[in-house]
């Protein structure tokens, strides 16, 4: 079990605190300079802001179909490097995100990445603007929104 002590970190409300993190979970929070627990790693965080994780509502993972541009694994790694823990991926893939099978492909490929990927389903089949997708089936499969972007 790894323990990290962040000293004098500022939260989103501007409050300076010490944080004890055990196995990636905040175990304790105390006023800045007061937490004296032993830790494997001590990080002086004065001037730094701590967030539980950011959510990027508009990403183009391009997987399936355009993995030469981006794929779920590289997109997730880039997100984590920037403190982003959740992303909503746009449906302009090939095939487009207009079937439950494509939604499941994305969710399965994203599962081991450490990033929660929220697929956005198409409004219309193939993003062609001709016929509406089966929204109930897409929602049951796990989409978080719809778009023809």
What residue ranges belong to the model's regions?
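Structured loop/turn residues at beta-strand edges in well-structured enzyme cores
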Residues: 4, 37, 82, 115, ...
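Hydrophobic "anchor" residues on beta-strands that sit immediately upstream
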Residues: 3, 52-54, 118, 144-145
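Histidine/acidic-residue-rich, glycine-tolerant segments that coordinate divalent metal ions
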Residues: 93-105, 109-149
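Histidine-rich, glycine-flanked metal-binding segment
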Residues: 1-3, 8-53
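Hydrophobic/aromatic beta-strand patches that form the interior of the parallel beta-sheet core
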Residues: 41-43, 55, 88, 118
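Active-site-proximal flexible loops/turns
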Residues: 15, 63-67, 129
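Divalent metal-coordination and catalytic microenvironments
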Residues: 9, 24, 47, 58, ...
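Metal-associated gating/positioning segment near the N- to mid-region
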Residues: 48-110
């Amino acid at each position: 079990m790894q323990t990290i002590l962040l000293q004098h970190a500022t939260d989103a409300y501007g409050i300076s605190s010490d944080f004890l993190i055990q196995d990636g979970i905040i175990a304790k929070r105390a006023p800045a300079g007061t937490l004296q627990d032993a830790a494997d790693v001590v990080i002086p965080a004065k001037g730094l802001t701590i967030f539980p994780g950011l959510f990027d509502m508009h990403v183009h993972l391009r997987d399936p179909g355009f993995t030469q541009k981006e794929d779920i694994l590289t997109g997730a790694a880039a997100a984590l490097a920037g403190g982003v823990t959740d992303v909503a991926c746009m449906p302009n893939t090939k095939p487009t995100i207009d079937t439950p099978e494509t939604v499941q492909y994305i969710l399965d490929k994203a599962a081991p990445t450490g990033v929660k990927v929220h697929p956005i389903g198409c409004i219309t089949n193939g993003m062609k603007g001709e016929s509406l997708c089966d929204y109930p089936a897409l929602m049951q499969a796990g989409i978080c929104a719809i778009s023809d972007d």
